[in-house]
């Protein structure tokens, strides 16, 4: 968890991003997002720069000037403004600055999809791609292999997604392949799905069933969960025949396991203790 000073610095940059997004076209926001992510990549690649940009002994203006000297002429005015706003804040550790830079780029991508009216679809495409990867061990290994260059894995993902997913989705998958927030590829995809849902003011419910829920069943389940959590719920289904029946629902750290498999396991455990 980030320290309070880092959270406040990110909040200030996030507010500036929101103000920019309100007056910009979706395509412009997407282009700015890509530049913000390139800045995050630079901060990741250059540990000395990362330390300098988070150095509490330097003033915010000095840190912003340092980054301006590096980025001038290489990114647009909006990306430069947002990046310098970010580094001008106080950061408790260089790693937290990197995390903030990555999140700002992702937030801009999601904002671009939101302005274009595509955010719900992007959320679903990210989840479905994660399901495809999880269902194919060879593909999962290829995309998660830390020994393979990110560019190589991104090319593979791009070949799979081109023509089947929106450009913002493809770019977010690339972010996940880069280990967004220090996570594994699968963990990063999951977090991106949750961030997309959160921008739509929704909570994600991961539902595991033996056979797909019908549209009306899914709607009723979503409505019930919304009543419990006090906000709209985005239901994400995974089909696993091994659960045999019933339903398992995970929302955040809450798990509701009503599967037949769980009940059978409980029965076996009870019998084994006799």
Curated annotation (Swiss-Prot):
Q: Which residues form a coiled coil?
A: none
**In this UniProt entry, which cysteines form S-S bonds?**
none
State a single Pfam family of this protein: OSCP
Q: Cell membrane: present as a keyword of the record? A: yes
What keywords are assigned to this protein? ATP synthesis, Cell membrane, CF(1), Hydrogen ion transport, Ion transport, Membrane, Transport
Tell me where it resides.
Answer: Cell membrane
**Per its UniProt record, what InterPro entries does this chain match?**
ATP_synth_OSCP/delta_N_sf (IPR026015), ATPase_OSCP/dsu (IPR000711)
A GO molecular function term, named singly, is:
proton-transporting ATP synthase activity, rotational mechanism
- Tell me the membrane topology, using the record's own terms: Peripheral membrane protein
**What is one cellular component GO term in this UniProt entry?**
proton-transporting ATP synthase complex
* Top-level taxon: Bacteria
Self-association state and partner proteins as the record states: F-type ATPases have 2 components, F(1) - the catalytic core - and F(0) - the membrane proton channel. F(1) has five subunits: alpha(3), beta(3), gamma(1), delta(1), epsilon(1). F(0) has three main subunits: a(1), b(2) and c(10-14). The alpha and beta chains form an alternating ring which encloses part of the gamma chain. F(1) is attached to F(0) by a central stalk formed by the gamma and epsilon chains, while a peripheral stalk is formed by the delta and b chains.
Q: What does this protein do?
A: F(1)F(0) ATP synthase produces ATP from ADP in the presence of a proton or sodium gradient. F-type ATPases consist of two structural domains, F(1) containing the extramembraneous catalytic core and F(0) containing the membrane proton channel, linked together by a central stalk and a peripheral stalk. During catalysis, ATP synthesis in the catalytic domain of F(1) is coupled via a rotary mechanism of the central stalk subunits to proton translocation. This protein is part of the stalk that links CF(0) to CF(1). It either transmits conformational changes from CF(0) to CF(1) or is implicated in proton conduction.
Record family assignment: Belongs to the ATPase delta chain family.
Could you identify this protein by its name? ATP synthase subunit delta
Gene label: atpH
